[in-house]
Amino acid sequence: MYRRRTTALLLAVALWGWFAADAWRTGAQGPAGSLREASPAAGPTAFVCPMHPDYTLDAPGRCPRCGMALVKATPFDVRNYRVDLTTTPAGLRAGQPARWTFRVFRPESDEQVTRFETVHERQYHLFVVSQDMAEFQHVHPLAQADGSWALDVTLPKAGYYKVLSDFMPSGGAAQLIAHPVVTSGFVGDLPSSRARLVPDTALVKTVGDLTATVSFDPDPFVAGLYGHLKFLLADRRGGRPVTDLQTYLGALGHTLIMSEDMVDYVHSHSLDILNAGDEDSEPVFLIPPGADLEAVRGGPEVVFDGLMPRAGRYRAWTQFRRGDVLHTFATTFEVREPAER
């Protein structure tokens, strides 16, 4: 819950018609959160993958899908933690920095949460996406002495935004919580600000010194099934395959996938496994657990998995680090119904 001047508050209230039914939904394999009935309180009983919470063990280990270390948590806990957002100044203006402060509260007791798990080198990931899906930020609030999280954010243009808080409270379940935000004085109407995505026809993209050839497996993606988003990376100048990617937040790549209506989200990291195996076999890792990612495999192919729950159009923002520079690729694609394949 965030504070605004009266005019901005009225705009925010109007936004809930857009967000009320869907603001808390997420992609099935990402951090869980939806408008579902609260489950009874329960203590940590298993070790869970933060990215694939449906995978659990009764002892520490690594996820067979993505290779991430499992953390102790409450599996299948569908309760949403409450996240309060305040901004200083209260009225946000495009192009001007503002201090954003987040406080997290437990669903059963409304007690403020002060302990969080570290997931990919950070305890709090924040995504800021404009409603037309043209603007994207992936940033990280810093822990404050009072248990809150804060950072300075500059919204690049006037309009509506969706803000996604991605964190895992210690002993709880991974969370991906959405907030609507609108800049002060914006007079545009909500429907005309919506994204109208067009699937990419050119799947070779260049950002900075990186050229990426993007592919999908299966092609096209199918709603309700896991698929792979693949990037084959080359140097822009000479065309040679890239093998010198640097790790970014503990992985060779990060991607956020969002549906056109901004209802469904997938937060995924580069896969470290070659074969997930089955219930009777161990996963085969592309990169041995604990190995130096950069030394073992710095490209050229980086693969992400994702499960898009519904047919429609989606946009992915995928980030790679090379030469101490962060490169962000935007990819727009279609997801078909199973019968349409």
Roles of regions detected by a PLM:
Residues 1-341:
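Intrinsically disordered, low-complexity terminal tails/loops enriched in metal-binding residues
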